[in-house]
Regions:
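Short helices/loops that flank or line small-molecule/ion binding pockets
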Residues: 73-80, 96-101, 203-215
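Bacterial Sec-exported substrate-binding components of ABC uptake systems
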Residues: 1-34, 78, 131-166, 211-215, ...
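Structured C-terminal subdomain patch of bacterial secreted/periplasmic proteins
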Residues: 71, 115-126, 218-277
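Alpha-helical, coiled-coil/dimerization segments enriched in small aliphatic residues
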Residues: 51-55, 175-203
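Short secondary-structure boundary segments
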Residues: 30, 88-89, 110, 171, ...
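Extracytoplasmic ligand-binding site segments that recognize negatively charged/polar headgroups
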Residues: 93, 106-125, 163-183
Length: 277
């Protein structure tokens, strides 16, 4: 009898999770891992999502199974899931309960670079679809990421001067700073990040006079009008030229393909000629 050929797809090991075959039922307890599963093309494997999942639309219809901090273990057990995904470490007791129910738990922490995001997709793709197929799916995502970054860079490269961008998490001074991935992405595609010289999402009030954004991106849509009328911002070019845009910040929080789509939209919005009055 000839030896059976080894399966090129499995086993796959990522961290402390080893799968010997493709999972048929997966639960995602973080909005980020949910989006990533769909980005890779394996949304149909999800039998449950977190109560905080809002994207993509298809995920919203899936059964809700709590969150990484408070999973509904009975629902997860009943779903038959063999793999549970999240971005934060569940408690020891939760981990034990899930493992006893036959599910392995993959914690995929937030990345601090584009390469780290791509690695997260590779890890996830491998587990979901195998060493060959899953890695190929992750490469497709990587290519899409690169093309969106190129699109953003191309839009801004047509501008006469490097635009100064404020990515405002909450009015007035909580914004992307130089130490954040968001701040680094702004710089990578050709913005000057307003908070580049500062850290930890905080611009110093004492430096207000130096805050001169050409464009402002508001993570809170309802802050757009506040910003436009505010003492801090009403005098800056961004407001005078109507370059204030609301963005869906969950795209950045989730580090999904949507983040790079959003970045390209931000660049195009900035580079667009102002409408003729």
């Amino acid at each position: 009898e000839p030896e059976p050929k080894p399966d090129p797809e499995y086993p796959v090991t990522v961290g402390n999770v080893t799968l010997t075959e493709a999972p048929t039922a997966v639960v995602s307890l973080s909005p980020a891992t949910t989006e990533m599963v769909y980005d890779l093309g394996y949304g149909e494997l999800l039998v449950g999502v977190s109560e905080y999942c809002t994207a993509p639309a298809a995920a919203v219809a899936k059964p809700r199974m709590g969150s990484a901090y408070q999973p509904e273990v009975e629902k997860i057990k009943a779903s038959g899931a063999t793999l549970v995904l999240c971005t934060v470490q569940p408690t020891e007791s939760t981990l034990t309960e899930l493992q006893q129910a036959g599910a392995q738990v993959l914690v995929l922490p937030r990345a601090d670079s584009v390469e780290g995001i791509k690695q997260n997709y590779r890890a996830l793709g491998g587990l979901l679809a195998g060493n060959v197929t899953g890695t190929a799916a992750a490469e497709t995502v990587s290519t899409a990421i690169d093309s969106k970054l190129a699109e953003a860079t191309a839009a801004l490269s047509r501008m006469a001067a490097v635009p100064d961008a404020t990515l405002l998490i909450s009015y007035p001074y909580r914004m992307a700073t130089g130490d954040t991935l968001e701040g680094q992405l702004l710089a990578q595609v050709g913005f000057h990040c307003s908070g580049a010289d500062y850290t930890n999402w905080l611009y110093p009030e004492s430096e207000l006079r130096a805050l001169e954004p050409d464009v402002i991106f508001c993570a809170e849509a309802d802050e757009v009008e506040t910003v436009k009328q505010s003492y801090e911002y009403k005098v800056v070019a961004a407001v005078k030229n109507d370059k204030v845009m609301a963005i869906d910040f969950t795209a950045f929080q989730n580090q999904s393909l949507r983040m790079f789509d959003t970045l390209a939209e931000m660049a195009k919005f900035t580079a667009a000629e102002p409408a003729e009055a």
